[in-house]
């Protein structure tokens, strides 16, 4: 699909479908007529009143993400007109554009259009507007048919999209498409079943990325991890027949980096719960998504490798399965992490934090300026914030503010949560330094406090993405399935 800036005025554009946006408060209906803006009135006149008739007959109100469409007369340069609601003007932001563009793209494809002109109002500046619209279109139209013997025939592909009347640069569109390639890469990793996405294939994927983009790659095998004392990670891994892979990919700019960062993604390619087996109704069949943090990490690798910022970034994932076997760790076992902390495993289904513990210790030893970890870590976070919002924990206000700003720009919802030190009392063990789980209340907070024990001095933040990593139904520019949540936030943070 080609996406480009169209310098042609709205009234002179020719193609299959023209999509326009209307604010909720901009439509004034009377019994006899509709009051339109000057530009809309000119378009309506060109279409012989089709636009005003469509709005009136459908009682279109301009509510966010609502849409209507109709064919127009054969004497015009377009076949169809699409009207998408932008909601209230005072709530209009970049993500409103993404949502509107997604609605336009899906409807144009449903209407079997091959060319689409999009005329939406500007937000912030022309390039930011172009980036948001491009992201909305690209992500909404992504289809993952890898595992279907006969992919559904969803109609012809949209071949060309023009952003009409927008003085944006081609570089802005290229920038957005590079980011989208990372989001889609993450989506497809997370959506793949556990017999397709394994620790071995994740390592192979890292090798492919490193080779394609000239990145530095280090893969630590089980023996290497043993030498580094990664007892927490290896304790989880010992129940699986598949070998664990500790993956470290480094992007280094050609110039002296202005900053060194680390991103750590939880990489459980399948989580059975271990001997604390997940029971019926627990969603065990969905535990392929427990490598969502690693999926986001890998997606960010792909985007950053193409964008080439002047920042050095280390991408780390301790990848394994959490399985049931005669070799699996027992509830009550003690594990020694690579910083010497001894952990009592009181629940084998709280394994992600064990793998992250050694990964965080490894990351800090690299001498980076800041660390972010991402993980589908707790159901408690989903209970607290729902399926759309990730939890953010950090003892560093500046880092938390940076991440929050990056997420706002990306339209990825996030909420800062407390690191209540008093709650660590619930993690204290009788004969070890700590347990891996605490009391049920505040479970997402105690999980973050557990991770905090493995970062000494480096600014650090933890993102619990258990909710937004997956959607069961189409939602905005996210299709049913894996969302690639976090890639755009991380890219914005790295570039900031």
Swiss-Prot record:
Main location: cytoplasm
Catalytic activity line of the entry: Release of an N-terminal amino acid, Xaa-|-Yaa-, in which Xaa is preferably Leu, but may be other amino acids including Pro although not Arg or Lys, and Yaa may be Pro. Amino acid amides and methyl esters are also readily hydrolyzed, but rates on arylamides are exceedingly low; Release of an N-terminal amino acid, preferentially leucine, but not glutamic or aspartic acids
PROSITE patterns: CYTOSOL_AP
Gene3D superfamilies for the chain: Leucine Aminopeptidase, subunit E, domain 1, Zn peptidases
Family of this protein: Belongs to the peptidase M17 family.
Function recorded in the entry: Presumably involved in the processing and regular turnover of intracellular proteins. Catalyzes the removal of unsubstituted N-terminal amino acids from various peptides.
Designated name of the protein: Probable cytosol aminopeptidase
């Amino acid at each position: 699909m080609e996406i480009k800036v169209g310098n042609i005025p709205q009234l002179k554009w020719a193609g299959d479908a023209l999509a326009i946006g209307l604010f909720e408060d901009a439509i004034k209906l009377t019994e006899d007529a509709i009051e339109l803006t000057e530009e809309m009135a000119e378009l309506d006149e060109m279409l012989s009143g089709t636009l005003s008739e469509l709005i009136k007959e459908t009682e279109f109100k301009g509510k966010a993400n609502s849409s209507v469409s109709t064919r127009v007369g054969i004497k015009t340069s377009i076949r169809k007109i699409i009207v998408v609601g932008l909601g209230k003007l005072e709530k209009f932001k970049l993500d409103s554009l993404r949502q509107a563009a997604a609605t336009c793209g899906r409807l144009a494809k449903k209407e079997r259009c091959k060319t689409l002109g999009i005329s939406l109002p500007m937000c912030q500046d022309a390039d930011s507007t172009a980036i948001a619209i491009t992201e909305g279109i690209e992500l909404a139209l992504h289809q993952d048919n890898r595992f279907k013997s006969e992919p559904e025939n969803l109609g012809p592909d949209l071949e060309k999209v023009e952003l009409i009347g927008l003085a944006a640069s081609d570089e802005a569109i290229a920038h957005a498409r590079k980011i989208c390639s990372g989001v889609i890469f993450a989506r497809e990793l997370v959506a793949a079943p556990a017999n397709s996405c394994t620790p071995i294939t994740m390592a192979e994927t890292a090798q492919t990325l490193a080779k394609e983009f000239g990145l530095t790659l280090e893969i630590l095998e089980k023996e290497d991890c043993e030498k580094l004392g990664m007892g927490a990670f290896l304790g989880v891994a010992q129940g699986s027949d598949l070998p664990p892979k500790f993956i470290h990919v480094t992007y280094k700019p050609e110039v002296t980096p202005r900053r060194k960062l680390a991103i750590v993604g939880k990489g459980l390619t399948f989580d059975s719960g271990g001997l604390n087996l997940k029971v019926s109704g627990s969603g065990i069949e969905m535990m392929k998504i427990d490598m969502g943090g690693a999926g986001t990490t890998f997606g960010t690798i792909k985007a950053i490798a193409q964008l080439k910022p002047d920042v050095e970034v280390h991408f780390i994932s301790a990848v394994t399965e959490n399985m049931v076997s005669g070799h699996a760790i027992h509830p009550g076992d003690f594990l020694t992490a690579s910083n010497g902390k001894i952990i009592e495993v009181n629940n084998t289904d709280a394994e992600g934090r064990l793998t992250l513990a050694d990964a965080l210790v490894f990351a800090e030893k690299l001498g980076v300026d800041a660390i972010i970890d991402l993980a589908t870590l707790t159901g408690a976070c989903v209970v607290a914030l729902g399926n759309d919002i990730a939890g953010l924990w950090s003892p560093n206000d500046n880092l938390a503010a940076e991440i929050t700003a990056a997420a706002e720009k990306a339209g990825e919802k996030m909420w800062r949560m407390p690191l209540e030190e008093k709650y660590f009392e619930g993690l204290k063990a009788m004969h070890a330094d700590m347990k891996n789980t605490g009391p049920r209340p505040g479970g997402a907070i105690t999980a973050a406090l557990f991770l905090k024990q493995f970062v000494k001095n480096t600014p650090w933040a933890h993102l619990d993405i258990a909710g937004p990593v997956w959607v069961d139904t189409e939602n905005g520019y996210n299709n049913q399935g894996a969302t690639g949540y976090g890639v755009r936030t991380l890219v914005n943070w790295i570039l900031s």
